[in-house]
C-alpha cells in the first residue's frame, strides 16, 4: 500500500534582509511605538515618515522630495520599504539604486524619467455594458454564400439568455459565433457577452444541471441575478510608463517591417519627449472627463550620491513638472565630492540647490538594547532559536562592529548549533563563528598591520 504525503503548494518566499518589515509601527495618533511592525527605535524618523504617508494619501505631497540621511546600517532602506507597506499595493512604489542610471544604450536622464513615470499611477474607471445569463437557445441562421458555390455562410446568431429576473433573445454578429464555438458554449451554460467589444466569456455550467452526471469536470455556477442587460464598472490600475511602452512599440502590425521587428531582438530604445507629451495630453483629457484619476506614487532612489551633476540638474526640472511623484532619496555619505565634478564638496553628495528643495529625515545609530531587539526579530523571521546569552553576545558584537555583521552571524551560528546537536544557538557557537569570520573593521586593521605583505 503506497502512502504519499501531500506537499503544500503555497509559494515559499526567500527571506530577504528586510522581510520582517511590515509597516511603520505607529499608533492611531501617529506616534511611534518602541517596537512594532518589525521596526525598532528610530521614533522621530518613523513619525516623520508617518506624516509623509498621510500627505501622500491625501495627494498633497506630489513633486516634493524627502532625504533619509544617516550612517550605514541605521534602517534607511527599511523605512522606505515600510512607507511602501503603509501605502498598500494600489499606490505605485518604484525602488531604484543611484548606479542604475548608467547605461550604454540609453541616456542617464532617460532612465530617470522612465522610473519617474513608473512611479505615477493612473486609475481608469470604465463602464461596460454586459449581457449575462444562462443560454436557453443557440441558433445560427445561414444564408446562401454571396461568392457563389454550394457552401452557406452564417448571417447571424440567435441566442436566448435567461436570468432570475427574465429572459432576452439577442441577434448577434457572425464573428461572435466563432467566439462562442471557441468557448464551446452550449445550452445550459452561463456566459457573458461584452456589448462594446463582443468578447464572450463562459463562466461555467448552470447549477440546475448539477445532478445530471455522477462524474463531471464542470464548474457549476448559480443562475445570474438581476437583468440580462447590465452595466458593470471596471477599475484598472496602470502606470504612465506602461502607457509609454505600449505606444512606443505597437504590436501586431501586418506589414513586413512589423513582422521583422517582432522576430529581431528588441533593442532598448528611448521614448521620445514628444510621445510622452502626447500621452500626457490624453491622460489630462481623461482626468478632465472624470474617466481616470491620477495616483502619484513613490520613487525611492537609494545611494543617491552615486548620481552625477547632470542627473541632479535634471531632477530639478523633473520634480517641478506638473506630473511628478513623491521622491525619497537615501544616502549614507557625509561631506563628499559630487560625482561628475572635480572639487565641489557638498553634504550627502547632493548639490546645495537640490538639498534646499528636500525635507531631510535623520536616522540615528541604534543603542545596544535596540540592536538586541532587531537581532531577535531577525532570528524569529528566519525561524532560528537563540538563547538569551547568545543574544546578549550578538548585541555586544553589533555595538562594537555593525548591526549587519551581527545579523549575518545568525545563520552560520545556527548551522554550527545543529552540527553540535543543539536546538538553539548558544554563546559558544557565536564566539566560534565570530572568530572564523572577520568584520570590516578588524579586516581593515589586519590590512593596516600587514600592509607591506600585500600587493600595491
From Swiss-Prot:
Catalytic activity: ATP + H2O = ADP + phosphate + H(+)
Modified residues (N6-acetyllysine): 453
Molecular function terms, GO-annotated: 3'-5' DNA helicase activity; ADP binding; ATP binding; ATP hydrolysis activity; ATPase binding; DNA helicase activity; TBP-class protein binding; TFIID-class transcription factor complex binding
InterPro entries: AAA+_ATPase, P-loop_NTPase, RuvB-like, RuvB-like_C, RuvBL1/2_DNA/RNA_bd_dom, TIP49_P-loop
Coiled coil stretches, renumbered: none
Entry-linked Pfam families: TIP49, TIP49_C
Subcellular location, record wording: Nucleus membrane; Nucleus, Nucleoplasm; Cytoplasm; Membrane
Keyword DNA-binding attached: no
Annotated binding of ATP, by residue: 70-77
GO terms under cellular component: centrosome; dynein axonemal particle; Ino80 complex; MLL1 complex; NuA4 histone acetyltransferase complex; nuclear matrix; nuclear membrane; nucleosome
GO biological process assignments: box C/D snoRNP assembly; cell division; chromatin remodeling; DNA recombination; DNA repair; positive regulation of canonical Wnt signaling pathway; positive regulation of DNA repair; positive regulation of DNA-templated transcription
Keywords, ordered alphabetically: Acetylation, Activator, ATP-binding, Cell cycle, Cell division, Chromatin regulator, Cytoplasm, Cytoskeleton, DNA damage, DNA recombination, DNA repair, Growth regulation, Helicase, Hydrolase, Isopeptide bond, Membrane, Mitosis, Nucleotide-binding, Nucleus, Transcription, Transcription regulation, Ubl conjugation
Cross-linked sites for Glycyl lysine isopeptide (Lys-Gly) (interchain with G-Cter in SUMO2): 2, 225, 445
UniProt EC number: 3.6.4.12
Record bears the keyword Acetylation: yes
UniProt function note: Possesses single-stranded DNA-stimulated ATPase and ATP-dependent DNA helicase (3' to 5') activity; hexamerization is thought to be critical for ATP hydrolysis and adjacent subunits in the ring-like structure contribute to the ATPase activity. Component of the NuA4 histone acetyltransferase complex which is involved in transcriptional activation of select genes principally by acetylation of nucleosomal histones H4 and H2A. This modification may both alter nucleosome-DNA interactions and promote interaction of the modified histones with other proteins which positively regulate transcription.
Entry protein name: RuvB-like 1
Species in which this protein is naturally found: Rattus norvegicus
